[in-house]
Amino acid sequence: MEKKDLKIIFLGTPEFAVESLDKIVENGYNVVAVVTMPDKPAGRGHNLLQSPVKQYAVSKNIPVLQPVNLKDEDFVEQLRSYGADLFVVIAFRMLPEVVWQMPRLGTFNLHASLLPDYRGAAPINWAVINGDTKTGVTTFFLKHEIDTGDVIDRMSVEINPEDNVGDVHDRLMSLGADLTLKTLGKILDGTLETKPQSAFADECQSPRPAPKIFKETCHVDWNRSVVDVHNLVRGLSPYPAAWSIIEDDGPLTGRHVKIFETQIDSSSSTNLIPGRMIVIGKDKIAVDCSDGRLLIKKLQLQGKKAMPADEFLRGAKLVNPRLI
């Protein structure tokens, strides 16, 4: 079979999926349709915003389907009418069985972790939050239970100590596109071999979950270790960002603050009071954790833009400040 003879439907929504879709198209595969989320109102004018995947598909004149309900009979029949051989899913919704069982060659998904570790909605965030030094991407065939299907292939990448989740996201986006193309090549030339996720038990005896990130997940508990808090900030930056509330004897009390960049203070700290803010000179902010002190390098006060600590201090009046 030639690339142009393999009819593919691509299902995805965010920027993370676009690089893989672009690689599929530019390498001569036949993407007959794209499925993505409906346009959403955005901004003050509530103008409809197209998903990054839709924007790309429109630019390439690829038909776009935007179902509200993936079980809708009209949508399912429209999907079936394309006669696709294969579905490729990247950063999309959970698919009903009637959809993922449709193509004769199956439906494979690209997941941003080394499965079976970090099944769930936010694998990149949790790998950084947990202080991992390695992560990766996995392609696997869909089955009933989410993120549990047989593995086609995996590729790994290092997480550097200074990386935040945005850095790792971009690295995995590129690596994922390479793996998607490699997986399609195996399907096309008949060299595909899969392994159950249990085959990776020697390196992942207790798979960790990667649940969706909620506002409560992002709230900093200053009673935790300095390493834990530092990794939480890294794992949520630049979006959605770790946050805390200023409590002090001045005008900023009760204001929310987002924290984007931190650094562990290597000097020994004594008499720690978790949450206490300490202004060092005119340009540094330190906060006590349970076992050490964390320097806040970039933050955003509620209603203001994000800024370095020195700029924040020039405009902020802090009186016995604490973070809660």
Sequence positions of predicted segments:
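N-terminal glycine-/serine-/threonine-rich beta1-alpha1-beta2 phosphate-ribose binding loop
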Residues: P41-D85
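Donor/substrate-binding cores of folate-linked one-carbon enzymes
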Residues: E15, E26-N30, M37, L86-P209, ...
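Short beta->alpha connector loops
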Residues: T13-F16, V68-K71, A91-M94, D265
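Internal anion-binding site segments
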Residues: D202-I324
